[in-house]
Design a protein with these regions (language model features):
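Residues forming the flavin
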Residues: 2-54, 58-150, 154-171, 175, ...
Length: 520
């Protein structure tokens, strides 16, 4: 049996196999030559003290002990060409992992995706960045892989209660992700690596007899006697099935409007909204690592911060070390920000959403929209930001200290946000109560993270798509919609996930529930 150890070591030891072997040999009092293999099981950074340490959990195999490298392999998928069909609406993580699970269970997924495949999306991303043109069906939110494909590929989830996180991570490794995601405390694939993984998943679905239909947008759900019968697409095609997984993501406003129009029960849901702050990565490194220079053995530093301000949570969201701010509008006439990092996180700046918890009462000015009140609140801020910044994909921007002092910034340096920025006093973008909380919150952040509150930091507005503004209620036991039999609201857009991993888990669960219902 291997010996398992928990230890703290210097970064230069953790990143050098020979130094680590030497260190461990002294810990267990054997010669380095007696150590056959070291498996790193978990890895995280402890930056609480000036002397930064790496936390490791390792398994040590000595000579003569049985060691066999664990090779992660794909499940044995059956061919489902002639199996019962299930419609999956949306090819984000919830939809794709639902499709894979359906195949494992012997069911045939028909995946429809309003956007283009990962390669086709790139042309539309260039158009929004360079030409300020928003394709309503193909953008940073819509298209193969969903919003996560081109917004970082973070795999961290706080909730272990949602399901088997390890299974999802191992499936991603089997489809090409680095095995590092299995051991890192905050695993991350990177926007440059994720598209190929997504493409490989799609090819497996097709190879097994499933269908994936791009540029195919849901325009109607066929319902009879409160049971689904199928769907209609924008092409006028009808696809019949009595099981539908609705995994359309947090930005599919037309789907929320369709459900509301058909009187399929939905409800407003609180979400969070604010700005995206960009700092020099070197500054964040110096704050987090308490040093002037990060060195070669440490990764670009992340940060996580939360404060209670006027009875509301204000916190960092989707923090991207060495990353880029992206334009994530899904319709003309609005601007939206988000962030992403390449796998090496090697860009010069760090960015993070800094957002405030909203309450249902905040949506009262939009009460006439009923369950869509939160969505209309969200939309109003995005449209106002678009107008204030010049009615292109430029975003309102302001230096951080200037914002806290209610001063328009005299100049805005070039940031990672490619379409560009316009100097705007952020108080004009947000309702007064949000502006006040943001101002007080940044001042408090500056007290907790010395150096964070600086005019080197540029705020971009708005960060508004943190989660869905609508929940599509479902039975907690069957996962079916409370009102419509055979309709399975799924993932982030339905209000049951927050990120790639939790969405993938929810997709698998919906597939399992469908199989269970068929067996009854």
């Amino acid at each position: 049996m291997p010996q398992e150890l928990l230890l703290q070591v210097l970064p230069e030891i953790a990143t050098n196999e020979l130094l680590l072997k030497d260190y461990l040999s002294k810990q267990i009092k054997v010669s380095p030559k007696e150590i056959q293999h070291i498996s790193i099981l978990k890895r995280s950074i402890d930056a609480r003290q000036k002397a930064i340490k790496i936390n490791l959990k390792v398994a040590i195999y000595l000579n003569g002990e049985a060691f066999q490298e664990h090779k992660i392999q794909l499940p044995q998928y059956p061919n489902v060409t002639n199996a019962q069909e299930v419609i999956v609406v949306g090819a984000g993580p919830a939809g794709l992992f639902a499709a894979l699970q359906l195949i494992e269970l012997g069911l045939k997924p028909i995946v429809i995706e309003r956007g283009k495949d990962v390669r086709g999306r790139r042309r539309d991303l260039k158009a929004i960045n360079v030409d300020h043109l928003v394709n309503e069906d193909s953008n940073y939110c819509f298209g193969e892989g969903g919003a996560g494909t081109y917004s970082d590929g973070k795999l961290y989830t706080r909730s272990k209660k949602r399901g088997d996180v390890t299974r999802i991570l191992e499936l991603l490794v089997a489809y090409g992700a680095s095995e590092d995601i299995l051991i890192e405390a905050h695993p991350h694939i990177g926007t440059n690596k994720l598209p190929q993984i997504i493409q490989d998943i799609r090819e497996k679905i097709i190879e097994c007899g499933g269908l994936v239909l791009f540029e195919t947008r849901l325009t109607d759900i066929l319902v009879k006697n409160n049971e689904v019968q199928g769907i209609v697409t924008q092409k006028g095609d009808t696809i019949l099935a009595n099981k539908i997984i609705l995994a359309t993501g947090h930005s599919a406003r037309d789907i929320f409007e369709l459900l509301d129009r058909k009187q399929i029960f939905i409800e407003a849901k609180p979400f969070a909204l604010g700005v995206r702050a960009e700092h020099p990565q070197s500054l964040i490194d110096s704050i987090q690592y308490s040093c002037d220079y990060r060195g070669e053995h440490l990764p670009p530093a992340p940060y996580s911060i939360v404060k209670q301000v006027n009875g509301r949570g204000m916190y960092s969201f989707c923090m991207c070390p060495g990353g880029v701010i992206a334009p994530c509008a899904t319709s003309p006439g609005e601007v939206v920000t988000n962030g992403w990092s390449p796998s090496k996180r090697d860009q010069a700046t760090a960015n993070s959403g800094i957002v405030i918890e909203l309450k249902l009462e905040d949506f009262k000015p939009f009460a006439k929209f009923g369950a869509l009140a939160g969505m209309e609140f969200q939309k109003s801020i995005e449209q106002k930001a678009w107008h204030l910044a010049g009615e292109t994909q430029k975003v309102p921007a302001q230096r951080m200290i200037d914002f806290t002092q209610n001063k328009v910034s005299s100049d805005i340096p070039k940031t990672s946000y490619v379409p560009g920025t316009t100097s705007v006093e952020m108080g004009a973008v947000f309702p007064e109560f949000l502006t006040q909380i943001l101002r007080e919150g940044f001042t408090e952040f500056g007290k907790s993270m010395k150096g964070y509150l600086t005019n080197e930091a540029i705020l971009h507005a708005p960060e508004s798509r943190t989660s869905s503004p609508v929940r599509i209620p479902r039975d907690p036991l069957t996962y079916e919609h409370l009102q419509i039999k055979g309709l399975y609201p799924c993932g982030e857009g339905a209000g049951y996930a927050g990120g790639i991993i939790s969405a993938a888990i929810d997709g698998e669960k919906c597939a399992l529930m469908i199989k269970d219902s068929i067996g009854k």
